[in-house]
Swiss-Prot record:
<keyword id="KW-1133">Transmembrane helix</keyword>
<keyword id="KW-1003">Cell membrane</keyword>
<dbReference type="GO" id="GO:0008289">
    <property type="term" value="F:lipid binding"/>
</dbReference>
<comment type="similarity">
    <text>Belongs to the ATPase C chain family.</text>
</comment>
<dbReference type="Pfam" id="PF00137">
    <property type="entry name" value="ATP-synt_C"/>
</dbReference>
<dbReference type="InterPro" id="IPR035921">
    <property type="entry name" value="F/V-ATP_Csub_sf"/>
</dbReference>
<protein>
    <recommendedName>
        <fullName>ATP synthase subunit c</fullName>
    </recommendedName>
</protein>
<keyword id="KW-0066">ATP synthesis</keyword>
<keyword id="KW-0406">Ion transport</keyword>
<dbReference type="InterPro" id="IPR002379">
    <property type="entry name" value="ATPase_proteolipid_c-like_dom"/>
</dbReference>
<dbReference type="GO" id="GO:0033177">
    <property type="term" value="C:proton-transporting two-sector ATPase complex, proton-transporting domain"/>
</dbReference>
<feature type="site" description="Reversibly protonated during proton transport">
    <location>
        <position position="58"/>
    </location>
</feature>
<feature type="transmembrane region" description="Helical">
    <location>
        <begin position="8"/>
        <end position="28"/>
    </location>
</feature>
<keyword id="KW-0446">Lipid-binding</keyword>
<keyword id="KW-0812">Transmembrane</keyword>
<dbReference type="GO" id="GO:0046933">
    <property type="term" value="F:proton-transporting ATP synthase activity, rotational mechanism"/>
</dbReference>
<keyword id="KW-0375">Hydrogen ion transport</keyword>
């Protein structure tokens, strides 16, 4: 195999990182909705923590995307 094909295989494998970020964000907000349904008075605190967690999970997906773009264009 030549280097170009290996770059595209590596880029395809980077999609796993983006898939993991999507699963993480969906789990965070699923848990948020069920927690708010159980205890509506804690909504503000739960939302703040969920948004921080979603931001961190989404950052991992963005890092994966940046690395994939570096692999393609380098």
């Amino acid at each position: 195999m030549d280097m170009v094909s290996l770059k595209f295989i590596g880029t395809g494998l980077m999609a796993i990182g983006m898939y993991g970020a999507a699963l993480g964000v969906s789990n965070i907000f699923s848990s948020l909705l069920s927690s708010i349904a159980r205890n509506p008075s804690a909504t503000e605190n739960l939302q703040r923590m969920a948004l921080i967690g979603a931001g961190l999970a989404e950052a991992m997906g963005l890092f994966s995307f940046v690395i994939a773009m570096l692999l393609i264009f380098s």
